[in-house]
Amino acid sequence: MGERRRANASRGDKKVANGEKPHVGQWGRAWEVDYFSLAAVLFLLAFAPLIVYYFVMSCDQYQCALTAPVLDLYWGKAQLSDIWDKTPALTWGAAKIYIVWVSFQVFLYMLVPDILHKFVPGYEGGVQEGARTPAGLINKYQVNGLQAWTITHLLWFANAYHFHWFSPTIIIDNWVPLLWCANLLGYSVATFALLKAYFFPTNAHDCKFTGNFFYDYMMGIEFNPRIGKWFDFKLFFNGRPGIVAWTLINLSYAAKQQELYGQVTNSMILVNVLQAIYVVDFFWNESWYLKTIDICHDHFGWYLGWGDCVWLPYLYTLQGLYLVYNPVELSTATAVGVLLLGLIGYYIFRMTNHQKDLFRRTNGNCKIWGKKPKSIECSYTSADGKRHYSKLMISGFWGVARHLNYTGDLMGSLAYCLACGFDHLLPYFYFTYMTILLVHRCIRDEHRCSSKYGKDWKLYTDAVPYRLLPGLF
């Protein structure tokens, strides 16, 4: 939502002079916790780690059959202790792999400034500004995720085809021990962020304390916790180590399939290609990501810290893991259909975001679908008392639905799952989860915008009445 030029300030000042009270945008997460939110927080803190373990264990011990462990326990064929005894423990080898991995990503993030933006047309890297925080600050970020991803994968392929320092299957071979390492990092980061918010916050004005320990621990207190000038917890953990690892994990799955069966199935290739497109897109548009809900709304706590270390790399890659244990060779027609669904979904996702970015960068002085875009003008006041102005576009994809980028994202998510066939439920967890996540994100984002823009937001929703599916929702 592009910032309006300073010329518009006179109109806003006139409204104040006429006695019209400006709307103060209290965006960001809640100050107070209702019972439903607290119950959801307690549920996730208690069961999210068990859910991840259950999915990984189901593949490791039951060929990815989700109901098999429950049935074995029900019929007395196994005890919980039997399942636990078969679970690989944390090993020093896995710990070394994980320490080297995270340290290398910190090195690339902090000590290798981006140079790609200097010679890659259209890529925006280097020092970039984020969105305005609730306290009125605009933080600067070192955007070098695409460079880090490229260096990491060049080294991966150089090792696989030339140096042979380690096996390409190293990740899948240590998958469960690495789970314990990821949990240790996730909980450590979340706990550190909580303590930091109390004792040495980066910006105390962007902290929110509810008084409820569990809610604050999960949803975070600090908006943008940092160490030093550049190490931003949100940007690092949202992109690295989880999303950089995503494509490496899939490559390790493909290598394992080759090792076990002597070939890589077309379904595994589809999953690798479609998810790689999403990952590369994320890093290509990392500067745009600074203006999204993860950065603009979420505080940094267990939800982001543990989620990015554990939930993302372990549950977002379930399709590839499933195909290691259950190889699927799709017919040509089915493979083409899945590919088209994924590519069309990506096109909608990317073009929707591109239209918003173009609109923001040009302050609406551009063409969307061959016409000058229409918009609704909004104003809001940050916590420092300053009044700001924005435009909400109601043309192009943004005139079809308020979150059509999420619709495209869901189409891509479904394509990943369809590549695995219909024999098991496990691959479809991702689509189910993403549907719940994005619908919730729709509602949460709109609540934030309603709080931020007030009556102006109502004008926008009247102009664009549907969220995801025109005519339905």
Curated annotation (Swiss-Prot):
GO molecular function, one term: NADP binding
Location of this chain's protein in the cell: Endoplasmic reticulum membrane
Membrane protein topology class: Multi-pass membrane protein
Keyword NADP: yes
Enzymatic reactions: cholesterol + NADP(+) = 7-dehydrocholesterol + NADPH + H(+); 7-dehydrodesmosterol + NADPH + H(+) = desmosterol + NADP(+)
E.C. number: 1.3.1.21
GO cellular component: endoplasmic reticulum membrane
InterPro entries (alphabetical): ERG24_DHCR-like, Sterol_reductase_CS
GO biological process, one term: cholesterol biosynthetic process
Keywords: Cholesterol biosynthesis, Cholesterol metabolism, Endoplasmic reticulum, Lipid biosynthesis, Lipid metabolism, Membrane, NADP, Oxidoreductase, Steroid biosynthesis, Steroid metabolism, Sterol biosynthesis, Sterol metabolism, Transmembrane, Transmembrane helix
Coiled coil: none
Binding sites annotated in the UniProt record for NADP(+): 356, 360, 393, 398, 405-406, 445, 449-453, 460
Keyword Transmembrane among UniProt keywords: yes
Stretch list, region Disordered: 1-20
Transmembrane portions of the chain: 36-56, 97-117, 175-195, 264-284, 304-324, 329-349, 419-439
Pathway connected to this protein: Steroid biosynthesis; cholesterol biosynthesis
UniProt record similarity statement: Belongs to the ERG4/ERG24 family.
Role of this protein: Catalyzes the last step of the cholesterol synthesis pathway, which transforms cholesta-5,7-dien-3beta-ol (7-dehydrocholesterol,7-DHC) into cholesterol by reducing the C7-C8 double bond of its sterol core. Can also metabolize cholesta-5,7,24-trien-3beta-ol (7-dehydrodemosterol, 7-DHD) to desmosterol, which is then metabolized by the Delta(24)-sterol reductase (DHCR24) to cholesterol.
Protein name: 7-dehydrocholesterol reductase
Source species of the chain: Xenopus tropicalis (Western clawed frog)
Gene name linked to the record: dhcr7
